[in-house]
From Swiss-Prot:
It comes from Prochlorococcus marinus (strain NATL2A). It catalyses: di-trans,octa-cis-undecaprenyl diphospho-N-acetyl-alpha-D-muramoyl-L-alanyl-D-glutamyl-meso-2,6-diaminopimeloyl-D-alanyl-D-alanine + UDP-N-acetyl-alpha-D-glucosamine = di-trans,octa-cis-undecaprenyl diphospho-[N-acetyl-alpha-D-glucosaminyl-(1->4)]-N-acetyl-alpha-D-muramoyl-L-alanyl-D-glutamyl-meso-2,6-diaminopimeloyl-D-alanyl-D-alanine + UDP + H(+). The keyword Ribonucleoprotein does not apply. The gene is murG. One of its GO terms (cellular component) is plasma membrane. UDP-N-acetyl-alpha-D-glucosamine binds at residues 11-13, 120, 161, 188, 286. This is UDP-N-acetylglucosamine--N-acetylmuramyl-(pentapeptide) pyrophosphoryl-undecaprenol N-acetylglucosamine transferase. Pathway: Cell wall biogenesis; peptidoglycan biosynthesis. One of its GO terms (molecular function) is UDP-N-acetyl-D-glucosamine:N-acetylmuramoyl-L-alanyl-D-glutamyl-meso-2,6-diaminopimelyl-D-alanyl-D-alanine-diphosphoundecaprenol 4-beta-N-acetylglucosaminlytransferase activity. HAMAP family: MurG (MF_00033).
Amino acid sequence: MPRLLIAASGTGGHIYPALSFADSLSNSWEIVWLGVPHRLEVELVPEKYNLIKLKVGGLQGNSFRKLFNLCKLLFASVQVSVLLRQKKINVIFTTGGYISAPSILGAKMAGIPVLLHESNAIPGKVTRLLGRFCDHVALGIPSASEYLQRCRTSFTGTPVRTEFLLEKSLPSWVPLGEGVLIVVMGGSQGAIKMNEMVRKILPCLIEKGCRVVHLTGKNDCFYRNRDQEKNHPNLVVRDFSDEIPALLRNADLAISRSGAGAICELMVTKTPSILIPFPSSTDQHQELNAAYMARFGGAIIVNQHDPEKNILKNIVSNLLDSNSLREMKLNMNNHDYSYPEKKIFEIIHSIS
């Protein structure tokens, strides 16, 4: 049985796509997972896959710290090279993050092929610096290729959990009725300002007969103040839901940040959206992520603004009072974002 090493660490944006891809392989490959101690993968990976932890850090900080971490990176790369030979790894799949750099360099030392996946429209630092040392770079958003001229790239899309691909009925706690269903995903980063914008237009949405599910994120105290929810049966406010696949598959409109994870979930569920990019995202990558969906008419971009302004309110009102939502849904249905896992597997098969 061929052996695949998955190097994914740190945030959900790196780990969840890798987990989704690993799960799609069934039992056809033996999988070894390379991560970092005390990060999210320690909670998510061991119950399914053999996790090997390696100490490595970024190159941030003062000159001494950067030099120290550079030495750790070189040492970790040698460790990875030895590990690859010991485990008889055939190919590496990595999704970025701290662990990607030593994995790519270690693979280069050991002569093992590497497929690097980049989810964002603007590649991260590791992808920009080390993508040229990989056999192939798979892209979640096609415009990222503009920044990777020296790399062999293919647009594959970003893997998502199987639940997003299945038809699902709405959770029982979602308001019933014929009104337009709007799902608001505040996200974990920078959600407070976006939630304030949405909270300001809730009376307008309710007045127009909409059903609203507002997922605020756990870092916002808004979800603790549920006076509005108590006053209207068509509004549900929660900090979090593990039933997002069902919500998006049934939603008429989503209002969301535009991180790579949100983009691929909206794409595979064919959900029209209003995207509010997080203005402090690295390299403003959320703006370009959003531009990808807006370019083919699947989304409208609204920049973060003072809730007292009527920008978001006017855009939502125009959507609800015209055929625009129907046209956006048609655009989403006509845009191909299918089978990312299959496309990635085909590349792995070709380079291994």
